Amino acid sequence: MKIIMLGAPGAGKGTQAKKIAAKYAIPHISTGDIFRANIKNNTELGQKAKTYMDKGELVPDELVVDLIMDRFKEADCANGYVLDGFPRTIPQAEALDKALSANGESVDYAINVEVPDENIINRMSGRRACVGCGATYHIQFNPTKVEGICDACGEKLILRDDDKPETVKNRLSVYHEQTQPLIEYYSGKGVLKEVDGTQPMDDVFAAIVKILG
């Protein structure tokens, strides 16, 4: 079972990917983790990726696909995997398909966790982080006992730059421009499945399990 997770930043696709991985005993693979592991282990591909990252440049698609295909060869991927954070663009999706088809494989499901922009802006701009211990809260869904003060250590809470409404809007516009076309791409291949991400987390997961069987 080869699964790709799609959805805007803040849609909750990472959380769902972890839940899928646990239920179906397949690895949750994120490109960030692959980069970190290869750089830490000083692999040839990791060294190549690091030269781009050190310059603040994007790692080329071909290299990312090489890193991912390398990860797929590991024993824990024998029954499939959940890929999170890749592909983000049509060229990346095409490169991944080409690499998979060379092994006689293809993507089984592309699951799109759908959440309207306004919900995502509310979700993310309501997040708060503790300056002391790093604990995270949400003013609506997971508030602290005393407003603006961490339950765990008593330090004050802040709104991180990443979660400010303007930053979230910018990230969403990049998503719509670059990643949204993937929805049509995978729909054309007959593997797209959409779930309503505005539901409670467990209901979203139940909908995904219904799709995967």
UniProtKB/Swiss-Prot annotation:
Its EC number is 2.7.4.3. Its main location: cytoplasm. PROSITE patterns: ADENYLATE_KINASE. Residues 30-59 are annotated as: NMP. AMP binds at residues 31, 36, 57-59, 85-88, 92, 160, 171. It is found in: Cytoplasm. GO terms for cellular component: cytoplasm. NCBIfam families: adk, PRK00279.1-1, PRK00279.1-2, PRK00279.1-3, PRK14527.1. This is Adenylate kinase. It comes from Lachnospira eligens (strain ATCC 27750 / DSM 3376 / VPI C15-48 / C15-B4) (Eubacterium eligens).
